[in-house]
Amino acid sequence: MRAIPLLSLLLSGWFIVPAHADEAQDWLIRLGQAEQQQSFHGTFVYERNGSFSTHNIWHRVQNGEVRERLLQLDGSAQEVVRIDGHTQCVSGTLIAGLGDSPNSAARPLDPQKLKNWYELAVIGKSRVAGRDAVIVSLTPRDQHRYGFELHLDKQTGLPLKSLLLNDKGQLLERFQFTSLDTDEVPSDKDLLADADCKPITLDSDKASAVKTAQVWHSDWLPPGFELTSSTSHKDPETKTQVNSLMYDDGLARFSVFLEPLNGATVTDTRTQLGPTVAVSRRLTTPQGEMMVTVVGEIPIGTAERIALSMRNNDGAATSKQ
């Protein structure tokens, strides 16, 4: 389970002593280990853009496999089942941020790398879902990513609560357990998806995916973000080949989607819902016009700059303003 991202930081960076940074790294290591070693089930609340939803989660680690099931309890039933971070089935329209793309399993947390892009600190203690927690803050060192405040369970290292704020201190996203049981291991029945949970089949063209990573690049990326994977598949509606490139800094992530327009008339767009932004820009290449779309939990100005920086290695590519 990804620790879904900060209440306003109460301590300025110059109050943070190195010992706190070392302690914060230790807690992040525990967090990474807990999600790969600790079974649990519980109920959590997810808040975004002023809207709340409640979810059950079952997370089982067994024989080296991490199996997870999420079920939304409010409104129409929405469900997702994952194995080792890869989505197996979904139902309903999952809230963005809770359901990742089928093949976008997160990389293990690496505090040594993260401290290059975030200031890490233990800033206090709290109590969440009846459990004692340690508060770890990750404050971005630049304007190209958001900050996190993680309330980690003292007993297991699991994230009991996480908050995400923009550079103005506004809450973008909240994840918080209301109950958590780490003693009982979820059963096969607990992890069994309902009949409405439709299997995910990704018709990925591996050869095209490799070519995408070779042909496309960005002239500019936020410091610390690296290409982690690429995919290519045919859109069932437009019948065009959609290529995507995925980047992350070890915590935040975004995707770049590239699709030929084939003469279609489209307009540039920029939208934001909570922490998730989507910026689309038309790009002229020797092979024709393309639509470049950047989607992720990054500031909208950063997403726009990335979209305008995409280049085709086969020849010059220019964005249309």
Segments (PLM) and residue ranges:
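N-terminal leader/targeting segments and the immediate start of mature chains
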Residues: 2-5, 10-66, 113-115, 125-127, ...
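Short, hydrophobic/aromatic-rich segments at coil-to-beta transitions
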Residues: 37-43, 64-69, 130-137, 158-161, ...
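An acidic-aromatic
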Residues: 49, 53-107, 164-178, 182
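Short, surface-exposed coil-to-beta transition loops
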Residues: 52-56, 75, 144-148, 160, ...
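Intrinsically disordered, low-complexity linker/loop segments enriched in Gly/Pro
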Residues: 102-148
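Gly/Pro-enriched, hydrophobic low-complexity segments
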Residues: 129-197, 271-272
